[in-house]
Amino acid sequence: MATTRLKTLYQETIIPKLTQQFQYTNVHQVPKLVKITVNRGLGEAAQNAKSLEASLTEIATITGQKPVVTRAKKAIAGFKIRQGMPVGIMVTLRGERMYAFFDRLISLSLPRIRDFRGISPKSFDGRGNYTLGVREQLIFPEIEYDSIDQIRGLDISIITTAKNDEEGRALLKEFGMPFRDQ
């Protein structure tokens, strides 16, 4: 498999820039992407097998990897959930697939969001990881408008080795993440 554009960019330009910016003494101190998780909670669709299948195929099409069905650990009567019922689906992307998905997300999908002015720089978790909520799956070019039955969102978490939010933000900004000005 050929090296993706973002991996080459990371190795050739991002590592030297961040080393200089944060005065790292070792190349292994530079933050890097570890994994990207794509998650969708099913909510009301948990009782509907057809909607679960549609979600599975959509996430598989978007990420290029088969999703795992997450199940309820215990019953919650208020939400009409029994133990073992499907409550969501998720995919963990690493390596080349992660870089390929991240490249498509930054360059193709995010600009397709209606009234897009950049993503919020406040969604970091304090440890340099970023989580992004997408309201509709139509922003991904792999999804055809006619093939969906209902508009559903998904969560994308970008996990890095950064020690704090400042390092994580610098890393993602160098990758080309379109952050909104504060």
Curated annotation (Swiss-Prot):
Keywords: Ribonucleoprotein, Ribosomal protein, RNA-binding, rRNA-binding, tRNA-binding. The keyword Ribonucleoprotein applies. InterPro entries: Ribosomal_uL5, Ribosomal_uL5_bac-type, Ribosomal_uL5_C, Ribosomal_uL5_CS, Ribosomal_uL5_dom_sf, Ribosomal_uL5_N. The keyword rRNA-binding applies. One of its GO terms (molecular function) is tRNA binding. Gene3D superfamilies: 3.30.1440.10. It holds the Pfam family Ribosomal_L5. GO terms for cellular component: ribonucleoprotein complex; ribosome. GO terms for biological process: translation. Belongs to the universal ribosomal protein uL5 family. Part of the 50S ribosomal subunit; part of the 5S rRNA/L5/L18/L25 subcomplex. Contacts the 5S rRNA and the P site tRNA. Forms a bridge to the 30S subunit in the 70S ribosome. This is one of the proteins that bind and probably mediate the attachment of the 5S RNA into the large ribosomal subunit, where it forms part of the central protuberance. In the 70S ribosome it contacts protein S13 of the 30S subunit (bridge B1b), connecting the 2 subunits; this bridge is implicated in subunit movement. Contacts the P site tRNA; the 5S rRNA and some of its associated proteins might help stabilize positioning of ribosome-bound tRNAs. This is Large ribosomal subunit protein uL5.
